[in-house]
Amino acid sequence: DNDQWKRYEIFQDTLGGRPYLFNGGLPPGGSDGSGAPGIDYQVPAEALTNSEFAAIYKEAQKYVGTPYVWGGSTPETGFDCSGYVCWVYNQNGYNVGRTTANGLWNKSQHISEAEAKPGDLVFFEGTYDTPGKSHVGIYLGNGMMVSAGDPIKYANIHSSYWEKHLAGFGRLSK
């Protein structure tokens, strides 16, 4: 049926959420401030039925395995956490420009974890010495995010490291 073809098309476009298996890229891993390797994660198919999130995820997953670059904001330069999120959302018709994690927090509607859905943002404080929000990721649902650690990778926001820095969730508007 048409719905099944749409899901198959999304699967093809996103390479099943595992692009490193298909393009010779690195698997999620390495270390960021958490010291933890990346997690092999596949976004549930039902989350991808939301076309807005599917488009955000399609763009975001292209860069899983890309090394972290402080101040980076394009695929050519590499990404830091806010550069990655800004790139993904700007490519999907959001007008967020290039800002910091704290800047994204200020641009977003603050929501609870219970209200958070795939495609919202998840924010952290104290991941390095800066006032306000110091890290941002794209929430994937089920306690998972994708963010620019080193490299860009999937992570569980309730792991011991991320849990102690969890500061809140935000939703951007077009």
Spell out what each predicted region is.
Residues 1-54:
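Hydrophobic packing segments in regular secondary structure
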Residues 8, 53, 57, 61, ...:
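Extracytoplasmic/secreted envelope proteins and their assembly/folding machinery
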Residues 37-40, 63-70:
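Acidic/histidine-rich, surface-exposed loop or edge segments in extracytoplasmic proteins
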Residues 46-53, 77-82, 115, 130:
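Solvent-exposed, acidic/flexible segments
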Residues 66-118:
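Catalytic cysteine-centered active-site loop
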Residues 110-113, 128-174:
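Aromatic- and glycine-rich peptidoglycan recognition patches
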